[in-house]
Design a protein with these regions (language model features):
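Flexible "arm" and connector segments at domain edges
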Residues: 1-123, 128-186
Length: 186
């Protein structure tokens, strides 16, 4: 990249290295300027420095900077983390659960109305709140969901194997029979 940049007159290796060094020094005052920061101060300072570097004038611009290509759970976690850095966060886990309950009730209400646009919106709000709970508990929501996905597959495999022992295919069982196998798998 540096060679192409040099050939096209944009930059050379020296400019790239100087830029990287400047960025490292600016973003790490606790290392290069003997500034004592705890982790929350470091993260807050880091975000402020990144905003300054990019000429951003608002916190929202930092939220918009989170890449759209990220999985939605990861993006939601990053959005909530940045909001929490400036103090927009729940004080207590009880508040998080109350928010989840509120969003759940709103989803139920919209399901009764049957408008898919609002159902989708409320489902998104509920998922966002659950990701916030995971963040609040210091649990990676992607990892937690992947564990549950694998648990479901393992239980489903158990059901299928046990149906086979009865000389039946899983899809030939009634829902009650499948539920019985599901409970056995747990």
């Amino acid at each position: 990249h540096c060679q192409i940049g040099k050939e096209e007159g944009y930059f050379d290796l020296k400019e790239v290295v100087n830029g990287i060094c400047t960025k490292l020094i600016n973003r790490h005052p606790h290392v290069f300027n003997n500034v004592d920061l705890d982790m929350s101060q470091f993260e807050k300072t880091w975000e402020e420095l990144k905003r300054d570097e990019k000429g951003e004038t608002s916190i929202t611009s930092g939220l918009k900077r989170i890449p759209n290509h990220l999985p939605a759970l990861i993006k939601a976690e990053k959005i909530q983390h940045k909001a929490a850095l400036i103090g927009f966060d729940w004080d207590d886990i009880k508040d998080v659960f109350e928010k989840i309950e509120e969003e759940y009730k709103e989803l139920l209400d919209e399901c009764k109305q049957g408008n898919i646009k609002y159902i989708k919106e409320e489902l998104g709000d509920l998922l966002f709140s659950i990701v916030n709970l995971a963040r609040f508990l210091h649990i990676d929501s992607e990892e937690a969901l992947n564990l549950t996905n694998q648990k479901f597959i393992n239980r489903f495999e158990f059901m299928e194997e046990n149906a086979s022992k009865l000389h039946k295919k899983l899809e030939d069982l009634t829902l009650d029979q499948m539920e019985e196998l599901w409970q056995s798998a747990k």
